[in-house]
């Protein structure tokens, strides 16, 4: 009889339960669950029980578990402040006078590193506009349900999207603008990648432009200068799953890390003229390229303003 080499067989031989089995029964810690969802192919590999301890040590698994346990029961702003204190980012701000003192606006930053970008923006806004709401991955609520008082959740998992979740996102969005809050939205929705020696922002979605038009609020562009580790960019070239498994490593390795945020001049919704895709491309270029070179740059509309 041939020896089977399925993941469950290897796991039984090693005296441990299959990672996939634990995920199905809900026996995984939330950090394990999030890692499993980002490594579906790897976690089914026959050698996964052997690879897992090594990878988890590299990716700072135990630190991530302690962090998640610490914020699990906290209200959103307290949880974010915990993360802020944990990282103690070395933050340099420019153009903070461009942040409206009251009333809704959309802060539209580039997205160089991941979760740490959100912490940096929180640090930048918490004294200027503590009434902020931040669009973020719905997974944040799975780690700390209290984030609902700070985060507008967006579901990224195709198989988990639903009309109910979409309605929830839309309702929380309307509430944030109705309350006159500062709304943070990373238009790329994905982390920048390394391309021929340059950190490259992924194409922006038109959400920020659409929301600014709908709610008639200005957009404040924000250029973030920061980067991830060489390990992240190396793995990104070879395995998207290994890259995605570094999500907590690339947060926790930012302790005392330098971030620079340049806030550009507010762009009135009336200047967002043209096809949404064209306006969005112009906004991305303005934020990622022009603000980096000239903090006083004025947004140039994609179409002539009548």
Q: Where in this protein do the model-derived segments appear?
A:
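Catalytic core of membrane glycerolipid acyltransferases/transacylases, capturing the structured
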Residues: 50, 58-62, 106-162
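Membrane-anchoring hydrophobic helices of lipid-metabolizing enzymes
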Residues: 2-108, 118-120, 127-131, 298-306
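Non-catalytic C-terminal accessory region of glycerolipid acyltransferases
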Residues: 2, 6-7, 11-14, 166-306
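Generic beta-strand structural signal
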Residues: 105, 130-133, 181-183, 220
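Short, charged beta->alpha transition segments
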Residues: 90-96, 137-140, 169-176
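Short, flexible loop segments at the rims of nucleotide/cofactor-binding pockets, characterized by
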Residues: 82-88, 111, 159-164, 197-198
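Residue-level detector of flexible, active-site-proximal loop/helix-junction positions
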Residues: 98, 139-141, 158, 226-228, ...
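Alpha-helical membrane-targeting segments
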Residues: 44-59, 70, 74, 143-144, ...
């Amino acid at each position: 009889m041939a020896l089977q080499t399925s993941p469950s067989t290897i796991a039984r031989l090693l005296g441990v339960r299959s990672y996939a089995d634990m995920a199905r029964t809900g026996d995984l810690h939330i950090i394990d669950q999030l890692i499993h969802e980002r490594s579906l192919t790897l976690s089914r590999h026959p050698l996964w029980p052997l690879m897992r301890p090594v990878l988890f040590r590299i990716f700072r698994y135990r630190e991530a578990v302690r962090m998640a346990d610490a914020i699990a029961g906290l209200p959103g702003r307290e949880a974010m402040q915990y993360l802020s204190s944990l990282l103690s980012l070395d933050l340099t701000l420019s153009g903070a006078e461009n942040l409206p003192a009251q009333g809704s606006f959309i802060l539209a930053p580039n997205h160089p590193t991941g979760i740490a970008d959100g912490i940096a923006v929180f640090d930048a806004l918490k004294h200027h506009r503590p009434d902020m709401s931040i669009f973020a991955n719905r997974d944040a609520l799975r780690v700390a349900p209290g984030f609902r008082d700070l985060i507008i959740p967006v579901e990224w998992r195709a198989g988990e999207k639903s009309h109910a979740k979409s309605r929830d996102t839309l309702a929380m969005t309307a509430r944030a603008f109705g309350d006159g809050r500062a709304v943070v939205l990373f238009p790329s929705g994905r982390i920048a990648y390394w391309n021929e020696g340059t950190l490259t922002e992924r194409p922006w979605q038109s959400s920020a432009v659409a929301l600014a038009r709908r709610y008639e609020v200005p957009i404040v562009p924000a250029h973030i200068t920061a980067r991830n580790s060489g390990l992240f960019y190396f793995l990104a070239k070879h395995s998207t799953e290994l890259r995605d498994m570094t999500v907590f490593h690339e947060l926790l390795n930012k302790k005392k890390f330098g971030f620079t945020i340049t806030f550009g001049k507010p762009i009135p919704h009336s200047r967002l003229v043209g096809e949404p895709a064209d306006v969005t491309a112009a906004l991305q270029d303005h934020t990622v390229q022009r603000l980096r070179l000239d903090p006083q740059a004025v947004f140039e509309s994609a179409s002539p303003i009548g």
